[in-house]
Each structure stands twice: as structure tokens, then as C-alpha cells.
Amino acid sequence: MAAFTLDLMAQLPEAYQAYAPAVDVLPLIPIFFFLLVFVWQASVGFR
């Protein structure tokens, strides 16, 4: 059982390689929301 678990854990990173481009972009999403606040406030005149 332990050998199977270790083998499964070794294969998981390779299984998720298709998601690598999305994972590279994910940290930028909060920055886009932060910039969106300024765009929103500029559109309403910084009330």
C-alpha cells in the first residue's frame, strides 16, 4: 500500500502539467482586481 501511495504521489505533478500555464497566471488575478478598483473609481469620479 505504501509503495502504491508513493508511486501515486510521484505521478501527480506530471498529471497536472497541462494546467501549468493557468497556474502561472493565477497570481496575477488579484492584481487585476486591484487595478479594476482604480478604473471603477475613475469612471465614477472618485466619490
From Swiss-Prot:
Alphabetical GO biological process terms: photosynthesis
Source species, domain of life: Bacteria
Prosegment location in residue numbers: 1-10
UniProt keyword annotations, A-Z: Membrane, Photosynthesis, Photosystem II, Reaction center, Thylakoid, Transmembrane, Transmembrane helix
Assembly behavior: PSII is composed of 1 copy each of membrane proteins PsbA, PsbB, PsbC, PsbD, PsbE, PsbF, PsbH, PsbI, PsbJ, PsbK, PsbL, PsbM, PsbT, PsbX, PsbY, Psb30/Ycf12, peripheral proteins PsbO, CyanoQ (PsbQ), PsbU, PsbV and a large number of cofactors. It forms dimeric complexes.
Function as written in the Swiss-Prot or TrEMBL entry: One of the components of the core complex of photosystem II (PSII). PSII is a light-driven water:plastoquinone oxidoreductase that uses light energy to abstract electrons from H(2)O, generating O(2) and a proton gradient subsequently used for ATP formation. It consists of a core antenna complex that captures photons, and an electron transfer chain that converts photonic excitation into a charge separation.
Sequence similarity: Belongs to the PsbK family.
Protein name according to UniProt: Photosystem II reaction center protein K
UniProt organism field: Prochlorococcus marinus (strain MIT 9313)
